[in-house]
Amino acid sequence: MAVRSRRPWVSVALGLVLGFTAASWLIAPRVAELSEKRRRGSSLCSYYGRSATGPRADAQQLLPQPQSRPRLEQSPPPASHELPGPQQPEAAPGGPSFRSSPWQQPALLPQRRRGHTPEGATALPGAPAAKGEPEEEDGGAADPRKGGRPGSSHNGSGDGGAAVPTSGPGDFLYVGVMTAQKYLGSRALAAQRTWARFIPGRVEFFSSQQSPSAALGQPPPPLPVIALPGVDDSYPPQKKSFMMIKYMHDHYLDKYEWFMRADDDVYIKGDKLEEFLRSLNSSKPLYLGQTGLGNTEELGKLGLEPGENFCMGGPGMIFSREVLRRMVPHIGECLREMYTTHEDVEVGRCVRRFGGTQCVWSYEMQQLFHENYEHNRKGYIQDLHNSKIHAAITLHPNKRPAYQYRLHNYMLSRKISELRYRTIQLHRESALMSKLSNSEVSKEDQQLGRTPSFNHFQPRERNEVMEWEFLTGKLLYSAAENQPPRQSINSILRSALDDTVLQVMEMINENAKSRGRLIDFKEIQYGYRRVDPMHGVEYILDLLLLYKRHKGRKLTVPVRRHAYLQQPFSKPFFREVEELDVNRLVESINSGTQSFSVISNSLKILSSLQEAKDIGGHNEKKVHILVPLVGRYDIFLRFMENFESTCLIPKQNVKLVIILFSRDAGQESIKHIELIQEYQSRYPSAEMMLIPMKGEFSRGLGLEMASSQFDNDTLLLFCDVDLIFRGDFLQRCRDNTVQGQQVYYPIIFSQYDPKVTHMRNPPTEGDFVFSKETGFWRDYGYGITCIYKSDLLGAGGFDTSIQGWGLEDVDLYNKVILSGLRPFRSQEVGVVHIFHPVHCDPNLDPKQYKMCLGSKASTFASTMQLAELWLEKHLGVRDNRTLS
């Protein structure tokens, strides 16, 4: 009886199971068809649905697809927000029942499992479409890219509880760059060549529907450009921004975890951005960027309620995959209901309304997504030596390609410094492990792996002690021979100090958040600096800091700290400007009779060294020596004797050009002309040229007139009659002057008055004696110059309005710097400025007269010698120690 009583219940249960099964087979397809019709009810954005590239087997194996029927479209939205597109034809029988997209789809993702029902409009529960508006077109069940998975709650936990696959470095981030057709060859190309290469994913540029460069008839630049149909380059780019976001959603939603909308004038640090995003969960609805509320004039006019915000478009907006999944189906409604002309405000409103989130409220976002708020900003970030620049992930703006390349160059230089510092750390670890394992430490580890210390070098004599330079925030005090005792800190040292202090502050504030305090740098009170040639640069800095405590009782107090720092040198690197053809070089060496070879075991470089008399032969670049002159026949006679021994007898490849100024009838120039004719008759093959000029002496005018006689590839040497030089100087003039790049400005050794300096111990070595007693390096003079004619013209030439002595060389030097040429300055041991009495004309320009008096005072003797002479004359004290 008990068994029989159970049979009716078993029959009822079996009937329910069969009934539900039949309903799923008979009713579910009809429900899916009705849902499909409702999804097509919207006329907005339907043109931008997913594409159907023909009937696909994997699409047809899912559910039976109803045929598309003609239907009445809704009344179109206002023209200002309508997305135009051609009317789509009906789908072929048996084919997919959705409209085709004008974009070409990427490769299909793996087919979904049989039995999964297609996702509808992917509208969120609790965030439906507006009342009276049908849901946006989804693209149907045939498109697997939508990511439709039944049972997905869209609450940030992923797809129906399934684990989100971990993305690799190539499919992590998708960056869409908004640009315009006119910027494809400039801003967009600069972005592609700089930061876009370091993005862990894909970067594409979005422009208008018009093909790139079509109007110019030129091929488009090598950029991955997406032409958005129905979108133009008008500003504000609201439509372009929303359609770009929809393109990301339709094509790459399941391929990338994060999506970024960027401007073409932003700079993105790909490595820092990846590190930041890897720490977040892309399955949650996250909307990242610099939080904005509008400027002062726009407060209350953007349609934002209290507590609402948006992410500013300039530094970039970042969307998680879940935000796009929720928001994009409602983009049509967002476009129809806009309250402002700011596309970033409207995107933020759409995310907040349908994505279930808004731009994160975080103070750090203002630092990570950097917007330049400098006063009178010029379209670029001027100060790069800044902790804010180093901490930022995105930097905006860089309006010109040159600004983008400048910033990228700075970032690469910082990367190089970081890698070199890492090599130093590895050498230290290697040296430590060798010591702990009682093994021999390599020489490279011994040199580069030393711990920081000021005692690496131990002097054994008094003159081996390395002296420190004293510095303040603005001034440098030095005891070096070739430097003034007090000078302003130059730009190179200033940049080095700024970088050093910046690194120190980053080290101090490394754990500032956990410690609950922040320390800001105020200024350098004073400090010391020296360079150890074997180990690095050493600093002792007294820093004024500002201590800020933000945990517990808030406190802000100034503090002073001493910092003992060392910047160690890393391994040197060598680069060949021109690749060395070893086989050809060996043949030339073996065939030569006056050359020999040296093989360097460390560098493996085979080089040829020739005898000195072969240097500067006729196969070298010809040097045109230009000498302006007025009177001073005896000095000119000495110059020609030196020119004969240095150039004429060894047959140097040079040409001498004398610019001879004469007053009155030119009677004083007869001797000069006869002397030149005598040398021409003595050396017929030598090239010498005389350019006579009348009027007051003007060095700039004479050199400008003489240089105009030659073509642009001529190497010019601006010389003075007071100089004597050797052949090695001419070779360095050739080597250190690079056409279009570099100008050689040798620092000349100038003799003191021999009546003062040699009154007790006259020299026997000749004029090329370099010591404190015989002369000084004329580091303030720029008159002796090696430059190409084309570079002289490019810099602007001499100021021919300057009359008399001085200033024309300083003016040209400034022009060379401003023209972008690189001045090469160094002490030149092959040239000596022979002493001559200086006469300063009181009728000179006041600035020229002051410079002339300063030059005259510096030529008498050294400070120590003048002091001895004064003591001997006035006090009868005689001390020969300084002259010994």
Swiss-Prot record:
Record text on cofactor binding: Divalent metal cations. Highest activities are measured with Co(2+), Mn(2+) and Cd(2+).
GO cellular component terms given for this protein: Golgi apparatus; Golgi cisterna membrane
Protein name: Chondroitin sulfate synthase 3
Glycosylation sites: 155, 281, 712, 880
InterPro entries for the chain: Chond_GalNAc, CS_glycosyltransferase, Nucleotide-diphossugar_trans
GO biological process, one term: chondroitin sulfate proteoglycan biosynthetic process
UniProt function note: Has both beta-1,3-glucuronic acid and beta-1,4-N-acetylgalactosamine transferase activity. Transfers glucuronic acid (GlcUA) from UDP-GlcUA and N-acetylgalactosamine (GalNAc) from UDP-GalNAc to the non-reducing end of the elongating chondroitin polymer. Specific activity is much reduced compared to CHSY1.
Gene3D superfamilies the record matches: 3.90.550.50, Spore Coat Polysaccharide Biosynthesis Protein SpsA, Chain A
Low complexity biased stretches: 60-69, 84-96
Catalytic activity: 3-O-(beta-D-GlcA-(1->3)-beta-D-GalNAc-(1->4)-beta-D-GlcA-(1->3)-beta-D-Gal-(1->3)-beta-D-Gal-(1->4)-beta-D-Xyl)-L-seryl-[protein] + UDP-N-acetyl-alpha-D-galactosamine = 3-O-(beta-D-GalNAc-(1->4)-beta-D-GlcA-(1->3)-beta-D-GalNAc-(1->4)-beta-D-GlcA-(1->3)-beta-D-Gal-(1->3)-beta-D-Gal-(1->4)-beta-D-Xyl)-L-seryl-[protein] + UDP + H(+); 3-O-{beta-D-GlcA-(1->3)-[beta-D-GalNAc-(1->4)-beta-D-GlcA-(1->3)](n)-beta-D-GalNAc-(1->4)-beta-D-GlcA-(1->3)-beta-D-Gal-(1->3)-beta-D-Gal-(1->4)-beta-D-Xyl}-L-seryl-[protein] + UDP-N-acetyl-alpha-D-galactosamine = 3-O-{[beta-D-GalNAc-(1->4)-beta-D-GlcA-(1->3)](n+1)-beta-D-GalNAc-(1->4)-beta-D-GlcA-(1->3)-beta-D-Gal-(1->3)-beta-D-Gal-(1->4)-beta-D-Xyl}-L-seryl-[protein] + UDP + H(+); 3-O-(beta-D-GalNAc-(1->4)-beta-D-GlcA-(1->3)-beta-D-Gal-(1->3)-beta-D-Gal-(1->4)-beta-D-Xyl)-L-seryl-[protein] + UDP-alpha-D-glucuronate = 3-O-(beta-D-GlcA-(1->3)-beta-D-GalNAc-(1->4)-beta-D-GlcA-(1->3)-beta-D-Gal-(1->3)-beta-D-Gal-(1->4)-beta-D-Xyl)-L-seryl-[protein] + UDP + H(+); 3-O-{[beta-D-GalNAc-(1->4)-beta-D-GlcA-(1->3)](n)-beta-D-GalNAc-(1->4)-beta-D-GlcA-(1->3)-beta-D-Gal-(1->3)-beta-D-Gal-(1->4)-beta-D-Xyl}-L-seryl-[protein] + UDP-alpha-D-glucuronate = 3-O-{beta-D-GlcA-(1->3)-[beta-D-GalNAc-(1->4)-beta-D-GlcA-(1->3)](n)-beta-D-GalNAc-(1->4)-beta-D-GlcA-(1->3)-beta-D-Gal-(1->3)-beta-D-Gal-(1->4)-beta-D-Xyl}-L-seryl-[protein] + UDP + H(+)
Topology of this chain in the membrane: Single-pass type II membrane protein
Top-rank lineage group of the source organism: Eukaryota
Gene (name only): Chsy3
Keywords for the protein's UniProt record, in alphabetical order: Glycoprotein, Golgi apparatus, Membrane, Metal-binding, Signal-anchor, Transferase, Transmembrane, Transmembrane helix
Subcellular localization: Golgi apparatus, Golgi stack membrane
GO molecular function: glucuronosyl-N-acetylgalactosaminyl-proteoglycan 4-beta-N-acetylgalactosaminyltransferase activity; metal ion binding; N-acetylgalactosaminyl-proteoglycan 3-beta-glucuronosyltransferase activity
Chain sites annotated for binding a divalent metal cation: 722, 836
Protein family: Belongs to the chondroitin N-acetylgalactosaminyltransferase family.
PANTHER family cross-referenced by the UniProt entry: CHONDROITIN SULFATE SYNTHASE 3 (PTHR12369:SF40), CHONDROITIN SYNTHASE (PTHR12369)
Named cofactor requirement(s): Co(2+); Mn(2+); Cd(2+)
EC number(s) reported in the record: 2.4.1.175, 2.4.1.226
Residues in the Lumenal compartment per record: 29-884
Cytoplasmic side: 1-7
Stretches for region Disordered: 47-164, 437-456
Ranges annotated as spanning the membrane: 8-28
